[in-house]
Amino acid sequence: MKLKHFTLTFLTLCVAGLAVPKTAQAASLSVLASGLDNPRGTAFGPDGSLYITETGRGGDGADGRCIPSPSAQYIPLCAGNTGSLIRITPDGQRQTVLDNLPSLALTPSGEQGAGPADIKFDAKGNMYLLTGVAGNPTSRDTVLGTPELGKLFKVDLNTKSLTSLADLALYETENNTDGSDLISNPYSFEIMGDIAYVIDGGANTISKVGLDGSGIQKVVAFPVLQTDPSKLEFPSMPPAGEIPGGENIPGGGLPAPGTGVTAVQDFPITFQSVPTAITTAPDGTLTVAEYSYFPYPENEARIFSVDPNTLEIKQIADGFTQLTGVSYDAEGNLYALQHINTSEWKEILQGGVVVGDISGSLIKIGKDGTRETIWTGNGLEAASGITLAPDGSFIIANRARLADTGEIIRIDPKAPADNKKVPEPASVLGLIAFSALATKLRKRKHQEELSEELLAKVETL
């Protein structure tokens, strides 16, 4: 899958839960955690903690473990052990659960990381971790020396051991389901019963994986995204070595293409879907969103419904730009997250230098098909993935493609007209409250143990 952002292995999708009834209030955005390296997946665990995957910032390339990026003018993607899994505990502590996990990112910016991508818990409380690759999977074990990338694992939190359940990257190498170029980058996954449904944005596929150790059971490719070539816009890239802030970046770049909607361009493009996000719909089907291919045409991304048994794919919505998250609220309304509202190349130079507006949007699609922008810009930037909190707000990985400045944010959609950004809380007690509430809602028999004090903490957000 050429020239597309495989490293948007973005976030865990919806954690099912009932909204806690509260009086309507202005929509607000709160920063719950900051200073992260390419944050992606979030999930509430059975212990009441909020778990967060950090894809990491890759390596410095000194050991030669680098490959050319298929999505960033072939700038080097270098491997390192900078990925991690962290959690915020019910008493407010930030802890590292797993560290020194393999990571792959642009060098030297650390942008567009691939590594620990998504996290989920099954109904029994077992943890599962998905890792991305962001490149040709045949280089994973040899050049990069990162055999753990491109796989779905079961995690033993007691021993910190990982048990491989599926090698998505190897499957792409051996099968290349969509018949296009050989690329794998598992983005996100959803669990239904004893089955995991894995979205691979590089391979353009959805895979059905048994959590019982039975492996990959079925793989289906998403339909090609056809766009009128005359409507495509292309960037004018500087020659190799002239990327601002990246003068010492090794490796080449393609010749600068022309600009404008009808310009002749030298970038190879393929019409592909690039799926990024998945969640369970109220009717028991799966809902999947796509990012789109380079040059990331605006207002072209689609949303699909997928039958969990047959993996039959049907388009249910379109007209979006670079989607990286989907979720449903308790009333059955669908929410879609736009990573950046304009084609990403207009706002971020190849190599990871932000030069423009990387604002994204959270869009509500009502059951009747009507659309409403719940939040746009104003702190929502290059975001990915949506986790529904028990009170009906959304947990999102913000600046999810950037090193050092990644965040976990909460958007409360109660009254979208106000669009109010609130300061970062002095503590993570609100986040802890979400975690505790999620745990109780997972185990309905314990709901009566939720205290008024905990609910008050949620209100303070």
Predicted features along the sequence, with ranges:
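Short, conserved, GDST-rich strand-edge loop motifs in beta-rich repeat architectures
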Residues: 53-82, 129-150, 230-251, 266, ...
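A short, hydrophobic C-terminal helix/tail in secreted or cell-surface proteins
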Residues: 421-441
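A short loop-to-beta-strand structural motif that recurs across blades of beta-propeller domains
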Residues: 81-86, 150-153, 205-207, 302-304, ...
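C-terminal membrane-anchoring or membrane-association module
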Residues: 437-461
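Blade-level signature of beta-propeller repeat domains, shared across WD40, Kelch, NHL, RCC1
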Residues: 381-419
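Short loop/turn segments that connect beta-strands within beta-propeller blades
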Residues: 89-93, 156-160, 210-214, 307-311, ...
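Beta-propeller fold detector
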Residues: 30-31, 95-101, 162-170, 217-231, ...
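Beta-rich, blade/repeat-based domains predominating
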Residues: 35-46, 81-82, 103-126, 149, ...
